[in-house]
């Protein structure tokens, strides 16, 4: 098997934004400065005061 290079670090863009809790780069919610992925957001939403997720 050929060896593969790690992905190039980007100085800006979607690949730079990470979830503060788990570190994933997929589905990050940036609104209100949350910077959480949707999965982490669902877990901590009640503590943050989002009533829809009680």
UniProtKB/Swiss-Prot annotation:
Function field: Binds 16S rRNA, required for the assembly of 30S particles.
Family of the protein in this entry: Belongs to the universal ribosomal protein uS14 family. Zinc-binding uS14 subfamily.
Organism: Pyrobaculum aerophilum (strain ATCC 51768 / DSM 7523 / JCM 9630 / CIP 104966 / NBRC 100827 / IM2)
Taxonomic path: Archaea, Thermoproteota, Thermoprotei, Thermoproteales, Thermoproteaceae
PROSITE patterns linked to this entry: RIBOSOMAL_S14 (PS00527)
Quaternary structure note: Part of the 30S ribosomal subunit.
Family matches, as Pfam families: Ribosomal_S14
GO molecular function: rRNA binding; structural constituent of ribosome; zinc ion binding
Any one GO BP annotation for this protein: cytoplasmic translation
GO cellular component: cytosolic small ribosomal subunit
InterPro entries, A to Z: Ribosomal_uS14 (IPR001209), Ribosomal_uS14_arc (IPR023676), Ribosomal_uS14_CS (IPR018271), RIbosomal_uS14_euk_arc (IPR039744), Ribosomal_uS14_sf (IPR043140)
Keywords: Metal-binding, Ribonucleoprotein, Ribosomal protein, RNA-binding, rRNA-binding, Zinc
PANTHER family reported in the protein's UniProt record: 40S RIBOSOMAL PROTEIN S29 (PTHR12010:SF2)
Cofactors demanded by this protein: Zn(2+)
Residues in the signal sequence: none
Residues given in the record as Zn(2+) binding sites: 19, 22, 37, 40
Free-text comment on the cofactor: Binds 1 zinc ion per subunit.
UniProt protein name: Small ribosomal subunit protein uS14
């Amino acid at each position: 098997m050929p060896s593969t290079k790690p992905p190039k670090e980007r100085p800006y863009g979607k690949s730079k934004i990470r979830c503060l809790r788990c570190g994933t780069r997929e589905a990050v919610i940036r609104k209100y400065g949350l910077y959480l992925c949707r999965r982490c957001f669902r877990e901590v939403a009640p503590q943050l005061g989002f009533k829809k997720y009680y």
